[in-house]
Amino acid sequence: MNKIKGGRHKSPVKLFEVRLYNAEANVIVLYGNSMDTSARLSGIVVLSVSSPIRVKNIKLRLSGRSFVCWADESRHASPGNRIRRQVVQILDKSWSFLAPNESAKVIDQGNYEYPFYYELPPDIPDSIEGIPGCHIIYTLTASLERATQPPTNLETALQFRVIRTIPPNSLDLMHSVSVSDIWPLKVNYETSIPSKVYAIGSEIPVNITLYPLLKGLDVGKVTLVLKEYCTLFITSKAYSSTCRKEFKRALVKKTIPGLPMVDDYWQDQIMVKIPDSLGECTQDCDLNCIRVHHKLRLSISLLNPDGHVSELRNSLPLSLVISPVMFGARPTEGVFTGDHNSYVNENILPSYDKHVFDVLWDGIPSENPQLQSGFTTPNLSRRNSSDFGPNSPVNIHSNPVPISGQQPSSPASNSNANFFFGSSPQSMSSEQTDMMSPITSPLAPFSGVTRRAARTRANSASSVFNSQLQPLQTDLLSPLPSPTSSNSRLPRVRSACTLNVQELSKIPPYYEAHSAFTNVLPLDGLPRYEEATRPSSPTESVEIPSNTTTIAPSPVPTIIAPALPSTPAPPLPSHPMATRKSLSSTNLVRRGVR
């Protein structure tokens, strides 16, 4: 509130005041501790005159000071030193809006604004009000020096507050405070509050749980008291050491007759209302001249079976802050209103699973949003994901949809690319359907066949992964010639182009990833066990039939072994073969006897 001093009733100055820009209700809000953030104090000095006036200068002064005073009640204090008092100048800054000159200047009729700004230091103390014998006040005072005889100067003052509050992403808002212990042979108790920090004017939910360990034990009245502990300091050359004075006061006291019984124990939640006026309580602070902290003390009466009453006491430490949304109305200065709980819920950090991707990809320019989304979206990383829509970049059951930033492929290129663009499952041949692994379709169930196909695909992908980083081509594999023999069937191996971007971006389950480390080659048509283990003849060698199909050279670095035809074993030669017996120990003995 601006207060104008000086001047006569019929003054040509109609308006003269100080206004702040970035301060709602004249409050500067700082977040975190004294070294985290700073704030800029900016505003204007408004002057409105109805007729020309002569002035010497227009000045503005920023002042901040701390005041500490108390009466020394010790017996050793002399009568002249009973009152201890100290005033410290925290801020002192001045502005002059007119050039200094001995001659007066004439200001014509009209409205004038004089801007100013100042960077507040990060360690500026909070505004303290409401504590007896201590306060910290910040004031902006503007003065208008008129060139009249006698001089009639005008002054206007604006008092603003500096509040340091906890940031909305502070961990103290999420940490609960709990005290639990056992009274041997009597009760097991636990008291807790869901958070450590509460705003002035809000409510504190106190949870109390008691488990009886003594038969016949009952709970009497429960008393909760919110206490404020203050310590004042004076450091001066006149004193040999730092003087201090400690005192405390009860802010809120609430008593209930007892606790309700739930099953075999007592449990209840009690709401404690914090005062909403700075004249009744003070926020937590730790400054050079004052220190303030708060505790919630509990007292529970226990009625023993023999008739005597025991009392259980404990305390919960907490912090009181001024919420930024609790700047009150001007008529009731110092009264703060607002919903602190909604402020915390709206500004609290999201959970890890919702925020981790924003942090990882923050600042990376997105040249192709749809293509990059395929690599980073969790929907494409789930096994058998079915979150595909009609406008998805890759859809095996829909017409080709061009990806943003890419040219649509021609029908000729799509015919050999094995992407299945523009083809429905009904129009595919049986051979094309066999080449399509069940894991490729997002709607296919996961079965044993799918696991074998996944293992084959994992090993194939590991061998051609480097080639997949280049632009996909549609004609990487030449068409295979048809086999001449009915009993020899060539294996169909999926080419590099069939492993599209979505398949490479999927994260396989554990058994697929585990099987990818095996050294099993992705080959079919291997010889049967009897053919592979049949011993070869020492005189004749088996010749490979001339009708064996060979594989055309392919740019894909995948080696495909030809399938051996299932032919009967070669006949034995007609002429008898000389056999030689091994010289056993029996034959040696017989030769020696003969």
Swiss-Prot record:
Residues 368-417, 531-594 are annotated as: Disordered. Keywords: Phosphoprotein. Residues 404-417 have a biased composition (Low complexity). One of its GO terms (biological process) is endocytosis. Residues 368-398, 534-552 have a biased composition (Polar residues). InterPro entries: Arrestin-like_C (IPR014752), Arrestin-like_N (IPR011021), Arrestin_C-like (IPR011022), Arrestin_domain-protein (IPR050357), Ig_E-set (IPR014756). One of its GO terms (cellular component) is plasma membrane. The keyword Phosphoprotein applies. Residues 565-574 have a biased composition (Pro residues). The modification Phosphoserine is found at residue 584. One of its GO terms (molecular function) is calcium ion binding. The keyword Phosphoprotein applies. It comes from the Eukaryota. Belongs to the arrestin family. This is Arrestin domain-containing protein C584.15c. It comes from Schizosaccharomyces pombe (strain 972 / ATCC 24843) (Fission yeast).
